[in-house]
Structure formats: C-alpha cells, structure tokens
C-alpha cells in the first residue's frame, strides 16, 4: 500500500509540537480590521493549542507523516 500524502493546505496551517499537540494561528486577521476593536485585534495575535479530539483528527487525516 502506498504512503499517505500530507495535505498541503494542512501543513501550512497546523504544526505538531514535540508532545503531540496541534497548534494553529488565530483566524480573522486578514481584512476587515476597521470594524473590530483594538482589544479584539490584540486578542487574535499568536497561536492556540487545539483541543485533543480535534487535534487527533487533524493528525490522522491531514498530517499522517507529521
């Protein structure tokens, strides 16, 4: 059976940590900033850790070689 390919869109959006957690960047910072408050924009910075159940699905289906 051939190896599973990694989804190229997923490898750009998600990163697997050394402990096996999945981290991702916050969404909603590309355009339309004028209608958001400074607090909302500030809170969208940085990365988040995905819930374990969702992270396991990402690894299994989209990042099999990750």
UniProtKB/Swiss-Prot annotation:
Biological processes, Gene Ontology terms: translation
UniProt cross-references to InterPro entries, sorted A to Z: Ribosomal_bL35, Ribosomal_bL35-like, Ribosomal_bL35_CS, Ribosomal_bL35_sf
PROSITE patterns in UniProt: RIBOSOMAL_L35
A Pfam family matched in the record: Ribosomal_L35p
Domain of life, source organism: Bacteria
GO cellular component labels: cytosolic large ribosomal subunit
GO MF annotations, alphabetized: structural constituent of ribosome
Family to which this protein belongs: Belongs to the bacterial ribosomal protein bL35 family.
HAMAP family named among the record's database cross-references: Ribosomal_bL35
Protein name listed in UniProt: Large ribosomal subunit protein bL35
Taxonomic path: Bacteria, Pseudomonadati, Pseudomonadota, Alphaproteobacteria, Hyphomicrobiales
